[in-house]
Amino acid sequence: DGDVVAWWGDEPRQRGELERIAPGDVARFFETEEELKRLAAYLQPYVLESPPDLHARGLRKVGELWKTWRRFRGVTGDDVSGLVRFLTGSLGEFLDRRFESDKLKRLILSNSLYGKHGGPYQPGTAMGLLFHLLSGGDAEQQAWQGHVIGGMGAITQALRAASEDLGVEIRTAAPVAEINIANGNATGNTLESGDECDARLVVSNADPTHTFLGLVDTTELDADVRRDVANIRMDGPAGKVNFVLSEEPRVNGMPADRTKPQRSLFTLIPTLADAEANYNASQRGELPERLWVDCVLAS
């Protein structure tokens, strides 16, 4: 219908936006936000840590249990049920129970179904509501904000410039054929050209399947590790297209007072039902009729 709905970072502006599009859901929205922040506090420390080792033995097992107990010692029964609901429930059912406004549901959907090759009514998708609350930021409960001017390649160039200032040698057009292993330790890599690079530490930014099953001799890995890596599901839920435009696109309904940063990121979002239908279409090998499109003007 041409309506542009904003998700503001400050409560007064967000409250005003909600009173415009979903007057009956305003109080429930902020109650839900506080609940999410409280639940995210239990999980946030695990973002930058290895998950608990469920197979640990002896003193190591005691240490794992102590660390987990310390994190959850203040948890209430309501919070336990809330965490279980978010870890196992569906985003669509959660939103349908909580809110009446379709526009509010679509606003939350646009920010909460990340990296999931599935529809919003599939089990586990409610976890997306906690995604932005697990990486610090506003009161250490808000994740990333903003995007890179010049596109994501600007990050690569900044890393390269900073590394070269520190004396790092960067080799391009040098595909790796194999990670060298000796006595159970990575000792470097061999390039497709046949050149070998020795190293005390080898870091791979390739996906786990290619790293462990493509670049490492599988005889060097435990059978359980090979099986676990092979079973990682990595179906991509999205495609990316870059356009070079002669001018900024005009969005129907975009208020004239929006600043450039506010106009630089917007989403063409389907309804919950259409988002579920999109996934079903992809499973049949079809392109959905109502695409979900994130638009970023990075320049």
Name what the model sees in each region.
Residues 26, 103-104, 167, 220:
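Secondary-structure boundary/capping signal
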Residues 147-149, 168, 174-299:
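Mid-domain catalytic core of redox enzymes
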Residues 2-16, 54-87, 239-274:
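Short N-terminal secondary-structure initiator segments
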Residues 1-48, 81:
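Dinucleotide-binding Rossmann-like beta1-alpha1 core, especially the glycine-rich loop
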Residues 1-7, 154-157, 165-166, 199, ...:
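Short intrinsically disordered, low-complexity coil segments enriched in acidic
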Residues 37-166:
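Active-site/ligand-binding neighborhood in enzyme catalytic cores
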Residues 6, 10, 24, 28-31, ...:
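Catalytic cores of large soluble enzymes that bind and process phosphate-bearing ligands
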